């Protein structure tokens, strides 16, 4: 730390790392990724090369691409300083149509954001996030939240 002190280097913990991961919309196993979620649902189609020789799961992914995914990972901005946490419900009226995977206050963008999986037939609907017992309006926002790979 002494060597980097003149350049502003300071210790950072897991919270800082997770916030940076979240703002860049990078998937984390146990949140956006699990053994029930496909790469196409997670927005990772760029890593799936269906034109390459056969690989485990190729037929299933080709079928999913042809018919469409059952759910989609979306980004949301919440009203006010409400914070959506993992597991909070995404609501379409009175119906639960998805679940929050990650959410926090973004110190870089100065707003409350979350990522959530939403059923394919509800991705274009008006949605709310159930924060504790209150539905909070959620506006779709493109992923990644902070698109640049470098800070300047």
Can you describe what each PLM-predicted range is?
Residues 1-152:
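Conserved, structured C-terminal
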